[in-house]
Amino acid sequence: MRFGVDEAGKGPVLGSMFAAAVRADPAALPGGVGDSKDIRPERRERLAKEIRESADAVGIAEISVERIDADETDMNTLTVEGQAEALSAVARDGLSGTVDAGDTDAARFGRRVADAVDTDVAVTAEHGADETDSLVGAASIIAKVARDTHVAELAAEYGDVGSGYPSDPTTRTFLADYVDRHGELPACARRSWSTCDDVLAAASQSTLSDF
């Protein structure tokens, strides 16, 4: 029995980031588990259901927009916290496993995650672990499905918000239109992102040009 941990939604300008941990016998996992970004959404959902059924335990942690925008933190620290919170939900003394490294220094990232978990676990951090470790790949799928569900909930509240990523024209249009109508950013926006600064600056310039 081992564990794998990964996160989804680190880079978007909209919504929460999610981390997931899966404790299981790798041999019990369904076939086709890998990096969630390479799997179509419908198949991700089916695999997530099968992973939950075959795993010994699954843990999920949500890192909210409010935590992301807090002055005293950064995304590396929040990724450590999210992975540690998800891992804490499935960890047992003496357990070992792999986490996807969210820092350029993989060893340092692994130490930080291990230090943030109360249970005595052995953590190995690797870059691209979601592509090489089936348990990390399984955690990647669970985290991505949680993030997809979250984005669908935002769309139900606000209308089409796109993927939530700064590079998505639909997301940028949503932000610009929302600010134009309401004079402020939506509550789901990560206000500390430069994308939000750009949208607010463009709205301010547009207002000035009206005079």
UniProtKB/Swiss-Prot annotation:
Cellular compartment(s): Cytoplasm
Entries under InterPro entries matching the protein: RNase_H2_suA, RNase_HII/HIII, RNase_HII/HIII_dom, RNase_HII_arc, RNase_HII_hlx-loop-hlx_cap_dom, RNaseH-like_sf, RNaseH_sf
Keywords: Cytoplasm, Endonuclease, Hydrolase, Manganese, Metal-binding, Nuclease
Residues in RNase H type-2 domain copies: 1-205
Residue sites binding a divalent metal cation per the record: D6, E7, D100
Catalytic reactions of this protein: Endonucleolytic cleavage to 5'-phosphomonoester
Keyword Metal-binding: yes
Gene Ontology biological process terms from the UniProt entry: DNA replication, removal of RNA primer; mismatch repair
GO molecular function terms noted in the UniProt entry: manganese ion binding; RNA binding; RNA-DNA hybrid ribonuclease activity
This enzyme's EC code(s): 3.1.26.4
One GO cellular component term noted in the UniProt record for this chain: ribonuclease H2 complex
Family annotation (Pfam families): RNase_HII
Cofactor: Mn(2+); Mg(2+)
Cofactor binding remark: Manganese or magnesium. Binds 1 divalent metal ion per monomer in the absence of substrate. May bind a second metal ion after substrate binding.
Function: Endonuclease that specifically degrades the RNA of RNA-DNA hybrids.
Family membership noted in the UniProt record: Belongs to the RNase HII family.
Name of this protein: Ribonuclease HII
Protein's organism: Haloarcula marismortui (strain ATCC 43049 / DSM 3752 / JCM 8966 / VKM B-1809) (Halobacterium marismortui)
Upper lineage: Archaea, Methanobacteriati, Methanobacteriota, Stenosarchaea group, Halobacteria
